[in-house]
Amino acid sequence: MLLLFAVMLTALFEMQLPHHPYNTLPALPPTQDLETATLLKAVAQAARALGELKGVCQTLPNPALLINTIALQESKASSAIENIITTHDELYQAIVQDLDIMLASGTISPSAKEVLRYREALYEGYNELQKRNLLTTNLFIRLMQTIKQNSAGIRKESGVCIKNQMTGEIVYTPPEGEDVIRQKLYELEQFINDPPHDLNPIICMALLHYQFEAIHPFADGNGRTGRILMVLYLVQQGYLDLPILFVSAYIIKNKARYYELLRAVTEREAWQEWCLFMAKAVEETAQLTLHTIQRIRIAQDDIT
């Protein structure tokens, strides 16, 4: 009985309390066995869809058109997750005209500007990978600065917390202290670029996305930066040649479940459920991107 009480007391102290900074956030990978039969099946289906997408992209006569179209859709959806809403017409108009002139004249909204900055950050990350196939803290900062158009760096202030938008209840408090945050990011870099494991990269993509969001290194722009990192990681690992996975489409369609599972990993280490969700996101959005390519090809054929 005494032993049971001691175990329960230990578990209570180890539990992450929502209003306490999560400075004890463990480094990746998790200690539990992730490669169950169910998850490996889901990962295989996601990998198959990515392989088909990669193969089709290699046959495109004008991949730049595809990159522009998909990147714009991903930018719009990822920004919508943060309640930044705009229209495709406004975005395409800004592409063919001078964005800064349109903004100064009031002919484009600040929301559209933020969406286009996301696309710019996606391109910037992809171009950096072509030069140096590494995902680093400095790159994370550059992506956020491009999205937010500021010179902010790692979050220094304390008291940052995530609240339920409906109730105001604190649901999560990320790590505090610049040194602590930088150490967490360094550990994440090591997991990404020099992994001491043989986990499937699609599982790793799910893990690193949670970890980045849990570290919450910036005052703003964490969600969008984290979603760019997922796509860049798949490029780094050779699953994609181009940054064209429309993953935010699945997340926005399942937004409540996405945030519920992020919280579940923190509260009860629900890694299996989280990784299954993300594997399904990869599979469905790879198929969605394939359908988009088919529509682009039909449109090109009609023009020619």
Predicted regions and their residues:
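FIC/Doc superfamily catalytic core
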Residues: 1-304
